[in-house]
Curated annotation (Swiss-Prot):
InterPro entries: ATP-NAD_kinase_N, ATP-NAD_kinase_PpnK-typ_C, NAD/diacylglycerol_kinase_sf, NADK. It holds the Pfam family NAD_kinase. The keyword Kinase applies. It catalyses: NAD(+) + ATP = ADP + NADP(+) + H(+). Belongs to the NAD kinase family. Involved in the regulation of the intracellular balance of NAD and NADP, and is a key enzyme in the biosynthesis of NADP. Catalyzes specifically the phosphorylation on 2'-hydroxyl of the adenosine moiety of NAD to yield NADP. It is an enzyme of class 2 (transferase). Its EC number is 2.7.1.23. One of its GO terms (biological process) is NAD metabolic process. This is NAD kinase. Keywords: ATP-binding, Cytoplasm, Kinase, NAD, NADP, Nucleotide-binding, Transferase. It is found in: Cytoplasm.
Amino acid sequence: MNSPFHNIGIVTRPNTPDIQDTAHTLITFLKQHGFTVYLDEVGIKEGCIYTQDTVGCHIVNKTELGQYCDLVAVLGGDGTFLSVAREIALRAVPIIGINQGHLGFLTQIPREYMTDKLLPVLEGKYLAEERILIEAALIREGKTAERAIALNDAVLSRGGAGQMIEFEVFVNREFVYTQRSDGLIVSTPTGSTAYSLAAGGPIMQAGLHAFTLVPICPQSMTNRPIAIPDTSEIEILVTQGGDARVHFDGQTHIDVQNLDRITIRRYRNPLRILHPTDYQYFKTLRQKLHWGEQLV
């Protein structure tokens, strides 16, 4: 096959029904068309891939996929997709999702049509979409204590004590407000259909260059979501945090102390997501959010 891709990485979601059969179909398909296949070692350890399917494949750590592959295919749900996206963002390697989960905003190709949808993509017939990511730093006593990136959102939230937290928000060093609430969601357009949407935030079209600041149960009802350009730098000063944390895509977190500062900006590399040529963003929203359907 005359393809712009040569080395294809595969990441699988553990504890997923029929994942071995789906992986078998994909690996066999790629080998038959002459691609070099790289497998995430965790998927093998978790029994997601038949032993015989590993023959002739390279087995690597998920963090190495961006180093060796020019395309990564995710077999799973949006959670698996998010975890892989953060790992490969450094290398700017494109990613494509095959849905083995439930909602599937990011992993959109149905597994039953997987090879039919992938063949044109591997031949170079696809739609490419760039999504911005968040880069966050935790500043403690004037020094950077932690760094993290996220595709969906960075969420400052109260901890297990259940008490409201208090913090100040700045955008480009300009004071915005002091807020008492259960927390604050800083969302990308990709994350606008996730936690942000559940908290009352707006849906932003995926290619929009913006962030939203979405309060979580604010004490003041006048605290509403705010949209800002993605060229902005956001700073959050935690004044009364208790056992607050900052969560990234709901998968990793950093513990926060009083007077910690969290700075958030756009990550230097966008994530490049590939879609079949019949992909339509608003069609996806209609299907996933059940717009225009008779519900009763």
